Amino acid sequence: MPSIWGKVPQQNKNFTGREDLLDKLHSGLRSDVTAVVPHALHGLGGVGKTQLAIEYAHRFRHEYDVVWWIPADQSVLVKSSLAGLARELNLPIAASAGVDEAVDAVLDALRRGEPYERWLLIFDNANEPEDVNAVIPRGSGHVLLTSRDQGWQSVVDTIVVDVFRREESVAFLMKRVPRGITEPDAHRLAEALGDLPLALEHAGALQVETGMPVDQYLRLLENETTRLLGTSKPSDYPMSMTAAWALSVSQLMERSPDAVELLRCCAFFGPEPIPRDLLDRLPEDFAGGSRLAGMLGDPIRMIPAIRELGRYALVRIDSETRTITVHRLVQALLRDELPEPERASFRREVHTLLAAAVAEENPDDNAAWPRYQALLGHISPSRVVQSTDPRIRHFALNVVRYLYSSGDFRSARQLVEQFLERWQAVSGDDDQYVLSAQRHQAIVIRELGEIQESYELNQRTAARMRQVLGEDHEETLLLINSHGADLRFRGEFALAFEHDQDSLRRHQAKFGPTHRRTLRAMNNLALDYLLLGDYAKARELQAETFMYQRQAGSGSSAQNVLSSWNGLARIVRLNGDYRRACDIGEDAFEYGVEQLNSEHPWTLRVAKDLSIARRRNGQLEEALDLADHTFDAQKRNVGINHPDTLAAALCLANAQRAAGQLTEALELLEDMAPRYPRMYGDDHPFKYGCDTNLALLLRVNGQLERALEIDRRALRGLDGRLTREHHFTLTCAINLASDLAALGDTEEARELGVSTLESLRNVLGDDHPLTLAGAANLVVDLLALGREDEAAGLKAETLTRYERQLGTDHPDVKVAREARRLDFDFDPPVL
């Protein structure tokens, strides 16, 4: 056995023939001695591609150290299956690491051949190449795919799998039905069934279970064919297969009508495993109108029905995972034989079962995410999008919310746009669930970095909600709270503050003072206070919000708790208490990794702010390492042109500068600076903040005139948007004074330093590190102008306060003690 043998289905003891295909596949894979060239088994459904791959894995397993099976029929599930190999390979990643991080580690380990060079990965039922090709490893091992998609023929070495040759069909039936069939009868059956392996398997299972004579089987097959031909059938499935299937169901109906009813219901799920507990008793508010409610509530009926389906090889029962799987071919045939009213009835049943399964589960709650994940593969195949039932639409939007709450924004967008297209066409623009879907859509596209589109969509939707639902409807309030983020992203901080004050009042009146939704509104208002520079009020409100959210029974989600936790660490840092900010940030980061995973969007946002706190606290190496990791993760997860990635880039450039990597920092900022106006506009505070950082790096790299020009322009912009009495603006003013001093304009630098220091004391207080930096820089200018007595007095006072605030060994204190200039930079907060 290989050292790692993962998820490979059991070997089929009735496997027959295919020796030429196995030899061709084996020799083809073994011939690739320098680099892996994937091979694909291609053919229509039911020809035995999967069985051939299973047989290959078992027959040649001695040639591999690792054999890993990956169900690949839905791209959303491929990565999670591949990520499971990380643990088996004992890769050095955190147990709470995200799926993408685990997949990257697995692909890298396979590419390097460490710890194993001989590996085989089997992607079963792969769809379009672009869905899977990105996660196919390259290295010294082998990759085998099975697929019905002809597109693989232009991508990989492909082996076409056709129906059995007649002698293989006969040999298979003789093995499958020992002592129950003659060779001539096997020939007759193979002819009638078109030599399709799946059809032969079903026929063989029926023969074994019932002992039916072949003549009777063929007569029934002929009689059932006429009815089946009267309904539509999939174009790539032969008639003989549909006839064989219908006969199996007909015989099963005589033994267990309940089993047939259950099977038909399962045909309207997706082809992924169906959790067994979906078929448990329905809650009372869902049981009304359910055609299966009686059976679902009676294990004496349900258990035998499931076992009958297994005996007839119509489902695969996995007792370990407690799931039931119906082959997609069987599902298609089952659906096609039913009249449309029956199809609609079974679809409603499946929708009810799906919705009931998570009726009590909050999609924001990370504890509920595995449950939602298990249902994800059934949403589109069951046509949830077509339902007009309010309970089902509510469930559908909860799935969207689960996706973006867990960080899968792209899948959330794809799903909600499918819902909107259908629901608007059926129900019109004023339907409550259409409006709610648009609210979710705006959240998703904002999280994907399309901030202007989110703003415009929320503006339109808010107007419709107020008109259709009313000012104080729950959906209207939820959108109002979300829309505050749009205003913050636009740099309209004062308008966002007014908006969020009103939102909080409405939430308190509607939900109460400590409801989880009210606490979200409080968190947003605390951020507004921060952006407007009122750090005392921001700290008070943020601490109150966090206290309520952390209480047992608050109902707040892990990501909302983490957002508030990080907000508290950030405001403590901006108040100048760097050591305590690090402590709070460390706790928040550990919570994010544990509750969400290390690459969840909110965990990465916390990591970015923790890096800033470490840098401010003088922990330069730790800050740089964390900033570098965070920037790489953001690029990988959301791309370079995203607000979180841009913020992580500034954090990294600042950490590089602090660590002395001046050239690298400047190169990064030269790339980032043009992206900020494209994201936020030409007159946004964050754009000016990025320019401030760029100017700083230009000056320390010797480009003095350009630095001065950029800082002057940035200061004018910040004066206009935020006024001079703001933390961001005063930071730019400190750096502009340093530009002037570097160019020899010492007196102008001193004058700017004096006015800036006065404002810093008024805004931040005498002991804030930024105030002390302004004072320390003014000391340098006074010394350069020969005003030594004035400089000495200011220096002594500044150092006393600095050492008390940051300690004698802090890098900034050392610079001030040596009468050298201090530089400060800008870090955009999470909005």
Residue spans of the language-model regions?
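C-terminal non-catalytic interaction modules
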Residues: D766-P769, A776-N777, A784, E788-L831
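Eukaryotic intrinsically disordered, low-complexity regions
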Residues: R460, R464-Q467, E471-S482
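Short coil/turn linkers that connect adjacent helices within long alpha-helical scaffolds
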Residues: Q386, A425-D430, Q467-D472, R505, ...
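Aliphatic-rich helical/repeat scaffold segments used for oligomerization and domain docking
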Residues: M1-A425, D429-H440, I445-Q467, R490-R505, ...
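Eukaryotic tandem repeat interaction scaffolds
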Residues: V593, L604, R615, A627-A776
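Conserved alpha-helical positions within TPR/SEL1-like repeat arrays
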Residues: L397-Y404, Q432-E447, E474-F489, R516-L531, ...
